[in-house]
Amino acid sequence: MIRLMGIDPGLRFMGWGIIDVDGNHLKHVASGVIGTDGSESVPLRLCELHGALKKLIREYAPAEAAVEETYVNRNGSSTLKLGYARGVALLTPAYEGLPVAEYGAMTVKKSVVGTGSASKEQVTMMVKRLLPGAEIRKADASDALAVAICHAHHRASAAHVVAGKRMA
């Protein structure tokens, strides 16, 4: 059995999900959303995300992490802020010594639903089917669990994994 963490980056809401994988069997362990206060400075919000992710990693002890790649939208400022949050999502597990994989949204959707053009509702529905009993309250948590499920399906491919190195 291996424990995996999926992360859906976001500066306002960062989704996270922990699953256990035993062969083809997937089990929901925990999931949720880390929220930050939009009135706070960006550096403070990034520190909050880092601290919360570090606490979750130490509490649930996943062996590997996976992060969804971000997309570029028309608003350059929003894209840049999302990139900052993604940096925290990549750095924190790597700093804690976890291998970190990255997957595009279409790959995640195709792995979970069977089509890269699936809606958020379809992804949530399939996550609930694949993880019976999981109570998912926010789309960001569902997306993070979908990233973890995608990683469970693709983790044998070393091309997606960047080795983490424990620094402290």
From Swiss-Prot:
Residues annotated as binding Mg(2+) 2: E68
Required co-factors: Mg(2+)
Biological role: The RuvA-RuvB-RuvC complex processes Holliday junction (HJ) DNA during genetic recombination and DNA repair. Endonuclease that resolves HJ intermediates. Cleaves cruciform DNA by making single-stranded nicks across the HJ at symmetrical positions within the homologous arms, yielding a 5'-phosphate and a 3'-hydroxyl group; requires a central core of homology in the junction. The consensus cleavage sequence is 5'-(A/T)TT(C/G)-3'. Cleavage occurs on the 3'-side of the TT dinucleotide at the point of strand exchange.
Cofactor details (free text): Binds 2 Mg(2+) ion per subunit.
EC number: 3.1.21.10
Subcellular location: Cytoplasm
Quaternary structure annotation from Swiss-Prot or TrEMBL: Homodimer which binds Holliday junction (HJ) DNA. The HJ becomes 2-fold symmetrical on binding to RuvC with unstacked arms; it has a different conformation from HJ DNA in complex with RuvA. In the full resolvosome a probable DNA-RuvA(4)-RuvB(12)-RuvC(2) complex forms which resolves the HJ.
List of catalytic residues: D8, E68, D140
Top-level taxonomic group: Bacteria
HAMAP family for this protein: RuvC
Protein name: Crossover junction endodeoxyribonuclease RuvC
Record flagged with keyword Transmembrane: no
